[in-house]
Amino acid sequence: MSTMIQYVLYLAILVVLAIPLGAYIKNVMSGEKTFLSKVLTPCENLIYKVTRVDREEQMTWKKYAVSVMIFSGIGLVFLFLLQLLQGVLPGNPQHLSGVKWDLAFNTSASFITNTNWQAYSGESTLSYLTQALGLTVQNFVSAATGIAVLFALIRGFIKVKSSGLGSFWVDLTRIVVHILLPLNLVISLLLVGGGVIQNLKSAETVSLVEPIAVSAEGEILEDTVIDLDTETVTVDGEIVSNAQIVTEQFVPMGPAASQVAIKQTGTNGGGYMGVNSAHPLENPNAFTNLIEMISILLIPAALCFTFGSAVKNKMQGIAIFMAMFLCLVVALGCIAVTEQVGTSQLAQNGAVNMSMAEQAGGNMEGKETRFGIAASSTWAAFTTAASNGSVNSMHDSYTPLAGMVTMLLMQLGEVIFGGVGCGLYGMLAFAILAVFIAGLMVGRTPEFLGKKIEPYEMKWSVLVCLATPIAILVGSGLAAVVPSVMDSLHNGGAHGFSEMLYAYSSCGGNNGSAFAGFNANTVFLNVSLGLVMLFARFLPIIGTLAIAGSLAGKKKIATTAGTLSTTNGMFVFLLIVVVLLIGALSFFPALALGPLAEFFGSIA
């Protein structure tokens, strides 16, 4: 019962916070005053003055798209060079060398696309300068880019016989100054208060309370007797040769809290530490876990209410929100149940039944005992529903069915809330498809929010919806026939295939999480995954802006008795069916070879 209360509490807090934030974002989008305007508007105006941006400019969809591409391209080149040259730049107290070109390209593509796929361990690969000036900055502007494209699409629904969608530069500035900076300042302070590190100290080495012994293979030896004077390790009275005695531990330092805040709210996901929010210095306790977890879906959920308010049809925003929310609840339920029950092998040895006051049992492999099944399962559902990718547990250790659900959430196109901005404009593309299908069934010209949906919008909507499946399936298909990729798999068989499919699903869905057994730091994988991320990010952006430009040029159609309602339960059901059909039809064969084969093999 207490576990169920946790799930309900997490979801309730999300909804309660999302509604007022959605109203605030709507005011920012339309340039209306907010309670922070007196402080932030002068900063915004100063940026326009310095950069000579015309705040009244109305860009066509093509100019808006070109601006997005140029801005992202500059970010890609800057971050790439910053990584290559970090060895000779300041802000590097650990004297880390420059990053290899293929990993630098992969990381640059990852962060400018809001994916934050990490084929490296942050605390041992990147300097403080690279983390702060490179990654953290991209966390802000890549998130702002996604929201800006959504703003352009919303204006497409609002405007009548117009070619202007607003200015990308104005939208970008407003989003960063009025939304992301104040929100993340508050969250950063909460995280620091909860124990997340935030400093510029060099990494420290501390003495362990008691020494441990490690075998030649790097595994910790148990039940050992360690003699520090003779430097010998014995197990059951026998000396273990080649054993190494460890008496000190490396403790990373750095500006973690500020990066953790934006990695969550911006659905970026890239951790300051290699193990992301499973690290006790990045997510030390239940309080910080709650803050970080709710932050994942806060803006994506709020944008649904922003959309409804902006198009002057709040029920439309609620309908989109309910479609996403219902899918999330079902996915969370599947993950939670399968993780609590575990596998037949765990049940046989009694592991899932070991319930104590501190631990409720279940599949605890790869999970932190300070979080348990409920917080870990909720985070897994939230982070893969959004294009976030941060983790507080290792998804590679989840049961086959739970792993499949996390994979499917990404493969659906990251539209079950999805990334900030991109999740909602992806779902709106599915909504256009749903309206078109419904129009065919009743023999009427499809329309959505008073705008006719014609072949031009349909073609671009299909492209937006299929970009993710194409990127994932083509990428993973090519990787499956490259011999060197097999060396990156920690496991063979169905689970090994799942590791590879998850990697391409994560990058194609701009998510960034991974099955930890997959070694992605090779030239082929760094380049191929980087290209998948770029394709899956910018093709939908171009398609969305093309739809926005077309809709803005149309006139409004009066609602009649024969107009399909897009705010009732029937439309919500139809929208969910369309999303699931495209996902299921596209990925069922691949899922059958991976997690489904592993599941049925485990019960055979």
Q: Where are each of the predicted segments found?
A:
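Hydrophobic core segments of alpha-helical transmembrane domains in multi-pass membrane transport
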Residues: 9-22, 71-84, 148-155, 185-195, ...
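P-loop potassium selectivity filter motif centered on the GYG triad
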Residues: 90-135, 198-294, 347-422, 486-535, ...
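Alpha-helical transmembrane segments and their helix-start/interface "positive-inside/aromatic belt" motifs
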Residues: 7, 56-74, 167-185, 311-328, ...
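C-terminal catalytic subdomain
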Residues: 429-433, 438-442, 459-485, 489-490, ...
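Hydrophobic alpha-helical transmembrane segments
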Residues: 66-76, 139-150, 292-304, 422-435, ...
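N-terminal alpha-helical transmembrane segments of multi-pass membrane transport
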Residues: 1-106, 151, 158-162, 166, ...
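Long hydrophobic segments that form regular secondary structure
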Residues: 287-318, 325-326, 387-459, 535-536
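A conserved hydrophobic secondary-structure block that centers on an alpha-helix together
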Residues: 126-200, 290-318
